[in-house]
């Protein structure tokens, strides 16, 4: 019986006298159709290296392995260690937020691979940030199940109410697409919110040198630090306001331009011009 079976899952939990832990955002996917849709969306091919975060009982791990992927899984809850060790993959009981992704090579990881995961919702943003700041050149694609509200935020367009710093951050590294929505009925126990799968196709090259990336995101974080403010006011602690006004005018923007109306490409132009003034 597949690990996506709710009967199999509940039988396991009874056998270890365990339960889903809310503190770890444990809502287990128990819908085989959704698992197959994730696999298709993720573009996993036989022989691909795949990093999975929070496998839990291993329902997603099982379909990744059936596709011929080499899976490395990071799971925080030791309750699942013995069960996951029965699958032909590398399992590490660890906190994914603290795990050094550079050590994947020690486990045989070769070249560019993929991330495919049902991310714990309480650490979604720290993990997405970690994937790209720690080793952005390691991934071909990143396909994650996250809270629907967050999925809409990271796929928002300039001018949308959800458009923000995380949107700009992820679009710098990848083409980010909202794939599909997932009902709470597809999980055990049922979460109180809807979920969604987001697929990111990572760029072959990035628009800035590695040495400039941190400074650029300091600018974009400051820009969105207080959403209702004008861009020039948001950046006043980083750059003199008159310089910001000068750059905005040079690019054809009004002094009243707000951060949530600006595209990534325009932020890059603003960054370069402010550096050169």
From Swiss-Prot:
SMART domains assigned: rADc
Enzyme class name: transferase
Assigned keywords, A-Z: Cytoplasm, Methyltransferase, RNA-binding, rRNA processing, S-adenosyl-L-methionine, Transferase
Annotated Pfam families: RrnaAD (PF00398)
Compartment(s): Cytoplasm
PROSITE patterns referenced in this protein's UniProt entry, alphabetically: RRNA_A_DIMETH, SAM_RNA_A_N6_MT
GO cellular component, one term: cytosol
Residues engaged in binding S-adenosyl-L-methionine: 27, 29, 54, 75, 95, 118
Keyword Nucleus: no
Tagged with keyword Methyltransferase: yes
Catalytic activity: adenosine(1518)/adenosine(1519) in 16S rRNA + 4 S-adenosyl-L-methionine = N(6)-dimethyladenosine(1518)/N(6)-dimethyladenosine(1519) in 16S rRNA + 4 S-adenosyl-L-homocysteine + 4 H(+)
Listed SUPFAM superfamilies: S-adenosyl-L-methionine-dependent methyltransferases
GO BP of this protein: rRNA methylation
Main subcellular location: cytoplasm
GO molecular function, one term: rRNA (adenine-N6,N6-)-dimethyltransferase activity
Superkingdom as given in the UniProt entry: Bacteria
EC identifiers of the protein: 2.1.1.182
NCBIfam families named in the record: ksgA (TIGR00755)
Similarity comment text for this entry: Belongs to the class I-like SAM-binding methyltransferase superfamily. rRNA adenine N(6)-methyltransferase family. RsmA subfamily.
Role summary: Specifically dimethylates two adjacent adenosines (A1518 and A1519) in the loop of a conserved hairpin near the 3'-end of 16S rRNA in the 30S particle. May play a critical role in biogenesis of 30S subunits.
Protein name listed in UniProt: Ribosomal RNA small subunit methyltransferase A
The species this protein was found in: Chlamydia trachomatis serovar D (strain ATCC VR-885 / DSM 19411 / UW-3/Cx)
């Amino acid at each position: 019986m597949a690990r996506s079976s709710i009967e199999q899952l509940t039988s396991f939990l009874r056998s270890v006298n365990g339960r889903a832990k809310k503190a770890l955002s444990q809502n287990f996917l128990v819908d085989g159709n959704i698992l197959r849709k994730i696999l298709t969306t993720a573009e996993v091919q036989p022989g691909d290296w795949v990093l999975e975060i929070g496998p839990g009982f291993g329902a997603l791990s099982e379909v990744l392995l059936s596709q011929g992927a080499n899976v490395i899984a990071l799971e925080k809850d030791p309750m699942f260690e013995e069960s996951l060790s029965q699958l032909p993959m590398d399992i590490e009981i660890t906190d994914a937020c603290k795990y050094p992704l550079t050590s994947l090579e020690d486990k045989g990881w070769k070249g560019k691979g993929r991330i495919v995961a049902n991310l714990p919702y309480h650490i979604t943003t720290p993990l997405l940030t970690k994937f790209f700041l720690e080793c952005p050149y390691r991934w071909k694609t990143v396909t994650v199940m996250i809270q629907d509200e967050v999925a809409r935020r990271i796929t928002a367009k300039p001018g949308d109410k959800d458009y923000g710093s995380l949107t700009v951050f992820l679009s710098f590294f990848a083409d980010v697409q909202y794939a599909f929505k997932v009902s709470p009925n597809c999980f055990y126990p049922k979460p109180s919110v809807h979920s969604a799968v987001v697929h990111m196709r990572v760029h072959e090259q990035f628009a800035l040198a590695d040495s400039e990336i941190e400074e650029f995101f300091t600018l974009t974080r400051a820009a969105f630090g207080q959403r209702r403010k004008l861009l020039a006011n948001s950046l006043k602690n980083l750059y003199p306001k008159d310089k910001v006004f000068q750059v905005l005018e040079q690019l054809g923007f009004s002094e009243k331009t707000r951060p949530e109306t600006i595209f990534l490409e325009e932020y890059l132009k603003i960054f370069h011009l402010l550096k050169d003034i």
